[in-house]
Amino acid sequence: MSDKHDKPDISEVTKFDKSKLKKTETHEKNPLPTKETIDQEKQG
């Protein structure tokens, strides 16, 4: 059971991790996202 849930979970987490990591990094560096940041994230 653990193995079955671990496989799909990792795949989904990895996909979300990329988006979350980018947003978290930008948020930590810039408390207020600028228009350029939003545009870059939208294009991402």
UniProtKB/Swiss-Prot annotation:
Keyword Isomerase annotated: no
Annotated family: Belongs to the thymosin beta family.
InterPro entries in alphabetical order: Beta-thymosin, Beta-thymosin_sf
GO CC annotation, single: cytoplasm
Function description: Plays an important role in the organization of the cytoskeleton. Binds to and sequesters actin monomers (G actin) and therefore inhibits actin polymerization. May be involved in the regulation of structural plasticity in the CNS.
Biological process, per Gene Ontology: actin filament organization; regulation of cell migration
Protein name: Thymosin beta
Matching PANTHER family: THYMOSIN BETA (PTHR12021:SF26)
GO MF assignments: actin monomer binding
Keywords, in A-Z order: Acetylation, Actin-binding, Cytoplasm, Cytoskeleton
Modification N-acetylserine occurs at: S2
Tissue specificity annotation: Expressed in regenerating axons.
Region of interest called Disordered, as start-end residue ranges on this chain: 1-44
Subcellular location: Cytoplasm, Cytoskeleton
SMART domains named in the record: THY (SM00152)
